[in-house]
């Protein structure tokens, strides 16, 4: 019977979903303890859904995620997506930086097949662990024909999110992942998948960022978080470390103090590409006189996702107007 089932590739990178703790009633645990075989052994019902082809890409907490793993993961995912025997790809990932990895893959993978990222907020040994059901649901979503051509998806806590829109909003709750600007695009309840919306921004097959043309390291882009009484010292340190671009997590509508603004304008004149984002969790950054063609606005991308897009944009051009167009299209 198994040989007649569709095949889903499962790529494991670590995280809480692969974590283990000493006690079911304690919150402390170590990420990336369980290998992919242990994960699959805990969910025998997956074998009734699909043939699971599992591979271990890394086994780390996602706070340690980096470009090296991104490229290794993306290249292997692309190889599997190009294989006619594979119906979709599911990726297990720590939740801390899951939204960044998902958005990176959304911009560089070329396929209409489903790609689903999934994680957990409670480790496998915890009371009411959420990883097993999340993974079961993620595989179910990847098997659903309506999941095709939607870009990279994130499945957590019975919700289906677009990679561009999803963010982590709470440090411990299982319902941490939200799409505050647009909402989830669908739901999945014990494997039953429903869609209500379609991602409209460019992704995957429409993207101009070809994985085959990208090299590590990507252009250096830093994020500077602003606050009351902010001085440009950290910003200057970023410039001194040869950042090609800087994302400003401004207050409110991407605003900064007068002294900081002057430093930003000077850096822009020297060719550093500066994107204004916000430390606020939702809403878009509106352009105005502050920009005057010197800065780029991030639309409604948060600072960490704006950084991913700016890194990729800088592999194509330094032209601010063209990069602004990218932020309005992706």
UniProtKB/Swiss-Prot annotation:
Domain Asparaginase/glutaminase per the UniProt entry, residue ranges: 6-330
GO terms under cellular component: cytoplasm
Active site: 16 (o-isoaspartyl threonine intermediate)
Enzyme Commission number: 3.5.1.1
InterPro entries reported in the protein's UniProt record: AsnASE_II (IPR004550), Asp/glu_Ase-like_sf (IPR036152), Asparaginase/glutaminase-like (IPR006034), Asparaginase/glutaminase_AS1 (IPR020827), Asparaginase/glutaminase_AS2 (IPR027475), Asparaginase_C (IPR040919), L-asparaginase_C (IPR027473), L-asparaginase_N (IPR027474)
NCBIfam families linked: asnASE_II
Name listed for the protein in its UniProt record: Probable L-asparaginase
Provenance organism: Helicobacter pylori (strain ATCC 700392 / 26695)
Gene coding for it: ansA
């Amino acid at each position: 019977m198994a040989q007649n089932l569709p095949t889903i590739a499962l790529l494991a990178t670590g995280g809480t979903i692969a974590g283990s703790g000493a006690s079911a009633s304690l919150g402390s645990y170590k990420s990336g303890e369980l290998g992919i075989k242990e994960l699959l052994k805990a969910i025998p019902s997956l074998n009734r859904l699909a043939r699971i082809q599992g591979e271990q890409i890394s086994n780390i907490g996602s706070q340690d995620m980096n470009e090296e793993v991104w490229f290794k993961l993306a290249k292997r995912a692309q190889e599997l997506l190009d294989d006619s025997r594979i119906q979709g790809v599911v990726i297990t990932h720590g939740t801390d930086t899951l939204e960044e990895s998902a958005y990176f893959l959304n911009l560089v993978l070329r396929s209409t097949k489903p790609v689903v990222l999934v994680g957990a907020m409670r480790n496998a040994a915890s009371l009411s662990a959420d990883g097993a059901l999340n993974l079961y649901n993620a595989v179910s979503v990847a098997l659903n024909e309506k999941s095709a051509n939607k870009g990279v998806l994130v499945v957590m806590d019975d919700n289906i999110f677009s990679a561009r829109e999803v963010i982590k909003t709470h440090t411990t709750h299982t319902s941490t992942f939200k799409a505050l600007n647009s909402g989830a695009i669908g739901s999945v309840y014990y494997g039953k998948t429903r869609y209500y919306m379609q991602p409209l921004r460019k992704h995957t097959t429409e993207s101009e960022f070809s994985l085959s043309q990208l090299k590590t390291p990507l252009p250096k882009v830093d994020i500077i978080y602003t606050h009351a009484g902010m001085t440009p010292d950290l910003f200057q340190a970023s410039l001194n470390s040869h950042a090609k671009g800087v994302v400003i997590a401004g207050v409110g509508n991407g605003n900064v103090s007068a002294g900081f603004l002057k430093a930003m304008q000077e850096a822009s004149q020297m060719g550093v590409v500066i994107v204004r984002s916000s430390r606020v969790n939702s809403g878009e950054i509106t352009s105005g006189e502050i920009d005057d063609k010197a800065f780029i606005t991030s639309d409604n991308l948060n600072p960490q996702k704006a950084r991913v897009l700016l890194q990729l944009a800088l592999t194509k051009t330094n032209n601010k107007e063209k990069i602004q167009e990218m932020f309005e299209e992706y």
